[in-house]
Amino acid sequence: MHDISLTAAKGEVIGVVGHNGAGKTTFSRALCGLHKACDGQFFWNGLSMDHKDRLRHSYMVMQDVNYELFADSVESECTFGIRNPKQTLVDATLEELALAPFRDRHPNTLSGGQKQRVAVAVSMICGKDLLVFDEPTSGLDFDSMTQVAGLIRRLSDMGKVIFIVTHDFEFVSRTCSRILHFDEGEMPDDVPVTMDALPTLRELFSISESRPGRTEHRKSRFCAADC
């Protein structure tokens, strides 16, 4: 990647799109401090942050959440690796995300949508300021997608800075305020998600879907009224 420059405000939800190999994953991992081999500077509230600082301030939800579910119950998962978690916050989050009935269940016994909600619950409880979601609607049906969209908006209301790597046009229309389009390690487009920008957004997603290497074609659920 090179010549990447942007700013993000608290509460902003930013989509990250582009074909496979365009630089989306490298960018996301660099944001979270998981990619050490990068030049340039990162600032948070005016303070420069190295990769260790970014690790402390960020949380990444992987495309396959099974790789980050380690505990033997949903409740334990929500406190795994978190210092001094507040039980009242855990209880309230499980209730809000409709996970309370499953608090004693093993995460591997849950549906795909429920597992995503567990990952979102952890992101709410851990107290991190920067959240990155990698294809959070991959494999989800329409109802589960809308639930995840609502949870993302809830995190935005909490003042989190959120980046979402996605190919899901309608999910973007329901959650994001702007789109970063990556191509060959560069970021040529930074587009607001508005009705005026709809033709550009359609073109960018068409480019993303038509490039070689796309292993799955998802028919867009986009409705212009959602923008």
Task: Say what each PLM segment does.
Residues 106-110, 114:
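Conserved ABC ATPase signature
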Residues 32:
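Helix-to-loop junction immediately C-terminal to a conserved catalytic motif
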Residues 166-167:
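H-loop/switch region of ABC-family ATPase nucleotide-binding domains
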